[in-house]
């Protein structure tokens, strides 16, 4: 073997130049630098699909009933490499769908099933998702058969819905239309825990107070979807666990009744697996050897018998008939006293005291053997917590009410991050409009847009007032769960009309002028707000001697208070907006990091973020008329002055005690401008400076205007799913 033989496993003969690991990335050496990667994580360079592939068009050609039927057949087609419990994969597929959707959190709209992210790290290797890679492999023949028209994101959720239908539940419906991503979602903050399954103490300020958990986190431990099934920090205490159940479900927009229904319905079927001690189980999919092919948690003791399979460590089923939708869960929960025991794997669980043989659970492999049913600490919380108990007692007395409540809650759980019904496809979509879908009526399109623009221009409103109002209306959009945006004009409703970031006095003035104009023209106020912003920008473009029109698409509707779940919008209140150079308070997170987060939710690239900030500054659109970052003496003119100043070495930048900066002339020492770090980052960050230099060039004044208009229009239309349908 010579020195160039790459089979020499004792060391690589050359230092390979590709950065295929994490230890040599710039993030390692400069961890505090602004990392723009979250703006470019799912672009065309990552996707294997053709550039012109449009999933909305592809899904329309899908054989919807055929997919449903094939998944239904798969439920009872047990495979030797992962046999079905009782010959039925229903419980496994339901857990797959539940855990795909259950990572959603209301605070920032991230997580959830809408992208098929369960296929990637970290979710695919969380301990709470153990064995779900087996479920995905079982579904692969279906995905393979239907190809591009069927996304993994849709299939992962459909599987559980079909399973419930197969086992006797009248489901509420199902919508296709989710679009796959092709890599991990690096924008999501899953927590700063020191390790997977670190104590809850690491994400709360007081373990006794579940609500002290850091926002927007919505799980009690890193690596879990909701709460520890054994109890808070692994200590059984149903009363304390109830507090964490209530908090985690509330943070994914579920009320107490929906939470109880999901807990009951989720454990009416299927079983937990604790066939061996956790330390005997192999690595997760991300950490297992290459020959395992992503098949994680290898269990040397698994012999094809359900009793030797290992997933959570708990062992057993919750009901006597785990493949049938019925009221057995509540029957057993209320019929018996329960005591804490341990599974074979050493996990805490609850089992009934003196159970009758007819209530025992048949073995998942050998029906002649019977076992005790089990409950988790979260299940016992349904009995111990007085609010949950009252709800569950009603469910117990009225199984039909339970079934309907659960079916609706399941639909909400699995569709919460899809946005409005304009994103729904297929014959199983329910006709009923639900308030959590943020419904918006269809808006008018036949009015005279040019005439309305003329009236707006004559209204006496300043360009800055109109631009700021349009921006505030649109900036609430979150690509994470397709909520917010200018459509619906909810900026005029509670709670948005009173948000400090929306400058209520200025907002009321602008709305007071625009609403009569909209009514007279037969236009929606939602359209009129955006159109007014466009008018303001076109005024600024003309002042700069340019002639670039701002595109406008009519058709936005106006939502009403009755269509708006005000409480669910409260979490969307911005406490900072780097685009308008505003922060309600000084936070531990820097203004530029908050701006980056907003840009990611809006679906912007780094260049789009830069061009919008530079443009909005010179347009005078800052919150409260602040002068920070307004690097121009031509306010209201759409120029490249911001970028010319930030790249000009005639100035030096001096930090002040209040966290802001002065821009001083190097020769005279005079203060010329003031700024925040959300301004200075465009000169300090190497990537953003490279972009700023492009727009500061003498030959790119027109390009800047065109790019600003394109980015502005992208934000204004971010929620116009009707234009894509």
From Swiss-Prot:
Xref: PROSITE patterns: PEROXIDASE_2 (PS00436), PEROXIDASE_4 (PS50873)
Pfam families: peroxidase
Species whose genome carries this gene: Dinoroseobacter shibae (strain DSM 16493 / NCIMB 14021 / DFL 12)
Catalytic residues, chain numbering: 99 (proton acceptor)
Classification via Gene3D superfamilies: 1.10.520.10, Peroxidase, domain 2
Protein name: Catalase-peroxidase
Enzyme Commission code(s) on record: 1.11.1.21
Post-translational events: Formation of the three residue Trp-Tyr-Met cross-link is important for the catalase, but not the peroxidase activity of the enzyme.
DNA damage listed as a keyword: no
Catalytic function, reaction form: H2O2 + AH2 = A + 2 H2O; 2 H2O2 = O2 + 2 H2O
């Amino acid at each position: 073997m010579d020195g160039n033989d790459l089979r020499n496993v004792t060391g690589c003969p050359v230092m390979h130049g590709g950065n295929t690991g994490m230890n040599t990335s710039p993030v390692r050496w400069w961890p505090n630098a602004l990392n723009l990667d979250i703006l470019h994580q799912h672009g065309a360079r990552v996707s294997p699909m053709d550039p012109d592939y449009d999933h909305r068009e592809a899904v329309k050609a899908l054989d919807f009933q055929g997919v449903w039927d094939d998944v239904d057949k798969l439920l009872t087609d047990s495979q030797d490499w992962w046999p079905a419990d009782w010959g039925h994969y229903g419980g496994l597929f339901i857990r797959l769908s539940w855990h795909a959707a259950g990572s959603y959190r209301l605070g920032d709209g991230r997580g959830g099933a809408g992208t098929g992210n369960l296929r990637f790290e970290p979710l695919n290797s969380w301990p709470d998702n153990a064995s779900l890679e087996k479920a995905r492999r079982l579904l692969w023949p279906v995905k393979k058969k239907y190809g591009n028209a069927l996304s993994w994101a849709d299939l992962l959720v459909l599987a559980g819905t079909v399973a419930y239908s197969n086992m006797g539940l009248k489901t509420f419906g199902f919508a296709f239309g989710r679009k796959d991503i092709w890599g991990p979602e690096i924008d999501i903050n899953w927590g700063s825990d020191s390790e997977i399954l670190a104590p809850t103490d690491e994400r709360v300020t007081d373990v006794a107070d579940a609500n002290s958990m850091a926002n927007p986190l919505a799980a009690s431990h890193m690596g879990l979807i909701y709460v520890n099934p054994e109890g808070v920090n692994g200590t059984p205490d149903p009363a304390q666990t109830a507090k964490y159940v209530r908090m985690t479900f509330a943070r994914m927009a579920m009320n107490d009744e929906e939470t109880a229904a999901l807990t009951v319905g989720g454990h009416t079927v299927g079983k937990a697996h604790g066939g061996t001690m956790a330390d005997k189980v192999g690595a997760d999919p991300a950490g297992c050897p290459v020959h395992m092919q992503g098949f994680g948690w290898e269990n040397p003791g698994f012999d094809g018998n359900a009793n030797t399979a290992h997933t959570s460590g708990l062992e057993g089923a919750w009901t006597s008939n785990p493949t049938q939708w019925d009221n057995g869960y509540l029957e057993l929960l209320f019929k018996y006293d329960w005591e804490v025991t341990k599974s074979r794997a050493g996990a805490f669980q609850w089992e009934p005291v003196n159970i009758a043989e007819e209530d025992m659970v048949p073995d998942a492999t050998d029906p002649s053997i019977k076992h005790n049913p089990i409950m988790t600490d979260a299940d016992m919380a349904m009995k111990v917590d007085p609010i949950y108990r009252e709800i569950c007692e009603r469910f117990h007395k009225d199984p039909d009410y339970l079934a309907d409540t659960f079916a609706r809650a399941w639909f909400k759980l699995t569709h919460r991050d899809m946005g409005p019904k304009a994103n729904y496809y297929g014959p199983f979509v329910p006709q009923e409009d639900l308030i959590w879908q943020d419904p918006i009526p269809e808006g008018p399109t036949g009015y005279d847009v040019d005439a309305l623009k003329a009236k707006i221009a004559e209204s006496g409103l300043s360009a800055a007032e109109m631009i700021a109002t349009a921006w505030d209306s649109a900036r609430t959009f979150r690509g994470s769960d397709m909520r917010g945006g200018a459509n619906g004009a909810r900026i005029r409703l509670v709670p948005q009309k009173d948000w400090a970031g929306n400058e209520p006095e200025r907002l009321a003035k602008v709305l007071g002028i625009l609403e009569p104009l909209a009514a007279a023209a037969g236009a929606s106020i939602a359209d009129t707000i955006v159109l007014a912003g466009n008018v303001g920008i076109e005024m600024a473009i003309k002042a700069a001697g340019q002639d670039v029109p701002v595109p406008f698409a009519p058709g936005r509707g106006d939502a009403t208070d009755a269509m708006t779940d005000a409480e669910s919008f409260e979490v969307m209140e911005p406490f900072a907006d780097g685009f308008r150079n505003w922060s309600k308070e000084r936070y531990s997170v820097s203004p530029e990091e908050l701006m980056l987060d907003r840009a990611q939710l809006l679906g912007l690239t780094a260049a789009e973020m830069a061009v919008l900030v530079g443009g909005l500054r010179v347009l005078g659109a800052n919150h409260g008329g602040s002068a920070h970052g307004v690097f121009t003496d031509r306010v209201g003119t759409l120029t490249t002055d911001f970028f010319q100043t930030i790249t000009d070495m005639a100035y030096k930048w001096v930090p002040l005690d209040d966290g802001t900066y002065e821009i001083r002339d190097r020769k005279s020492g005079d203060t010329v401008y003031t700024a925040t770090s959300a301004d200075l980052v465009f000169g300090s960050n190497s990537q953003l400076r490279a972009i700023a230099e492009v727009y500061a060039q003498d030959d790119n004044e027109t390009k800047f205007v065109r790019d600003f208009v394109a980015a502005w229009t992208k934000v204004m239309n971010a929620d116009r799913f009707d234009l894509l349908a």
